[in-house]
Design a protein with these regions (language model features):
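N-terminal loops that bind phosphate or other acidic moieties
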Residues: 1-169
Length: 169
């Protein structure tokens, strides 16, 4: 038994492509896409997410980790989890979709439990403190008194936990 993965994306093609990529690196892990709407448009579908979660839960599951692309996909995934008989078996990862999915799939392939799979996905986004000094600085930031590494260099974005304008756009 391994941890199962569910990919929730606004785009069916993105979900399918991300699953295809991760499956190349973790052939024994069940990875299910739940992308797009039922009528083929961009958006999320509560029914698609619930179906993927139910399918993943039906297959000797050691837990399910869900990865999402954008904010409303998170809300859809959270809503779907609330409808499950055992919502405690599902963890939502706060990670970039493609990179996080690949890391999660490899961790699941290696036998990690659901918390370890979630942690692997999230470590892609937030490197462990021990590795921060090895990350190339993104800018010189005198107001912080240090070089930003693996974080937004825009001061207003840093104050908002990474949400803010992107320089040069």
């Amino acid at each position: 038994m391994t941890v199962k993965l569910v990919v929730v994306s606004h785009s069916e093609k993105i979900a399918d492509g991300a699953v295809e990529l991760a499956a190349q690196m973790a052939p024994d892990v069940l990875i299910l896409p739940a992308g797009g709407t039922d009528d083929g448009r961009i958006g999320t579908s509560l029914e698609r997410v619930m179906a993927a979660l139910e399918q993943a839960g039906d297959v000797n599951s050691d837990g399910i980790v869900v990865l999402t692309d954008l904010g409303s996909a998170v809300m859809t995934a959270e809503s779907a989890v609330e409808f499950l008989a055992d919502p405690s078996s599902v963890l939502l990862a706060d990670a970039p979709l493609v990179e996080g999915l690949v890391a999660a799939a490899v961790a699941a392939q290696a036998g990690a439990d659901s918390a370890g799979v979630k942690e692997a996905a999230e470590a892609v986004y937030r490197p462990p403190a021990a590795l921060v000094q090895r990350i190339a600085p993104t800018a010189n930031a005198p107001p912080r008194g240090r070089l930003p590494r693996g974080e937004d260099r825009e001061e207003s974005a840093a104050a908002l936990a990474g949400i803010g304008p992107t320089p040069g756009l």
